[in-house]
Every structure is written in structure tokens, then in C-alpha cells.
């Protein structure tokens, strides 16, 4: 029995699932840290902070940067810095700076993963409604989807500011299923991280975990999704569609 035979809609995470956004996010984080005269983190470190929305990203960046600054000053024999600004206020300032810089670099620092457009097109052609659920701040979502030419595939888009509770809370997924007019168990959710799989389980949605995303450096199998795929187009046969690579071969 195909565990996805009752699927009537598919929803996707964005960062690490459909798009590689690490370059743009890391650039904006580092520019914001630099503006506050704090150590910059670099892409490899920022990747481990992605997934819980911009506010949590700023908290993680600030915590690391203050610790790194203290370590560097101690190594150089300098006294620690007494911050006049409370950490909460610094997070707020950092977020404001991040939003400004990310708006400048988001499009040029974000790329579709392989087979994403073909897979979305095949699912849409099958008549399945498609949704997007991301913790990314809502104002950045629509312009990014348009720039990458994938906005046309989604009938429902939920950004991080559209719900009170972000993933891993089930609310965003339940809202998408409601707007699609289907039961949660009829909506497949595809993601790359622990947050995605936890949200799917809490909402009662079957889940696909992709291995190529960020996921805080953890293997996706630790989150126990219903199915694990190496590539996004691997989910097409499970939904009764030809693998996109096979389809491309037929069209050549």
C-alpha cells in the first residue's frame, strides 16, 4: 500500500528545501554584526542557526558574537567589554539591521535547488494544490518567490509573520490544509529540518524529509519523517508521477 495514496495537496518548507538561501542570510547576518562592531560569523556557522525565523537567528548570532568577542579579547590580554545596551535591545537592533541588509542581498544570494521547478510544475499539472510554509519573515517571501519564478506554483503561502506560532508548532500547516480545503492527513509536508518534521507530526500530516538541507547539522533521519529522499524529485513516483529526470529524457 502506498502511504501517500490519499494525498490531496502538498506543502513545502522554503529555506533548505526549495532554495539554498545560506549565502544571502549569512551575508546579511555578518553585515549586521559588523555594523555593531561584533565578530562576523561566516556562512558555515550561520547555516547551523537557520530554521526558526529571523528573531531566533538574531539571538543565536548575538550570543555567539558576544562570546567570540570575549574570547578574542581574553586571548589578546584585553579586558572584557561591558555592554551598555541590554542583550534584548541589541537583538532588536540587530534584527533591524539584518532586515535592511537582507532586503539588499536576498535575491542574489538565494538559489533554487536542483529539480525544484520541474517537480513543482509536475505536481501542479497533476492538479494538486501546493502550499508554502516558511518561518522566513513574510515581507521577504513573495518577492523571493517571484524572483525565482516559482510563485506561480503556490495557491497558499504562509510566512513567519502570518501566524502567531511558527514551526515546529502545527498551526501554520493546519492553516494551509484548511485553506486548501483538505484534512491535515491528506496534505503531504516536505521539509529538510527537525522543525519541519515536528510540525508535520503535530499537525497529523505525512512527511518527507530531504537530506540536503541545513537542519542544524543533524541528519534528517533522527527526526523520523515518514519517508527520506535524497532529491526533491524523488517524491514524484510516490505520488504516481514519473521521475522528472525520466520525463526530461522522454522530452529530449
Curated annotation (Swiss-Prot):
The keyword ATP-binding does not apply. Pathway: Organic acid metabolism; glycolate biosynthesis; glycolate from 2-phosphoglycolate: step 1/1. InterPro entries: HAD-like_hydrolase_sf (IPR050155), HAD-like_sf (IPR036412), HAD-SF_hydro_IA (IPR006439), HAD_sf (IPR023214), PGP-like_dom2 (IPR023198), PGPase_prok (IPR037512). Its EC number is 3.1.3.18. Belongs to the HAD-like hydrolase superfamily. CbbY/CbbZ/Gph/YieH family. Specifically catalyzes the dephosphorylation of 2-phosphoglycolate. Is involved in the dissimilation of the intracellular 2-phosphoglycolate formed during the DNA repair of 3'-phosphoglycolate ends, a major class of DNA lesions induced by oxidative stress. This is Phosphoglycolate phosphatase. It comes from Shigella dysenteriae serotype 1 (strain Sd197).
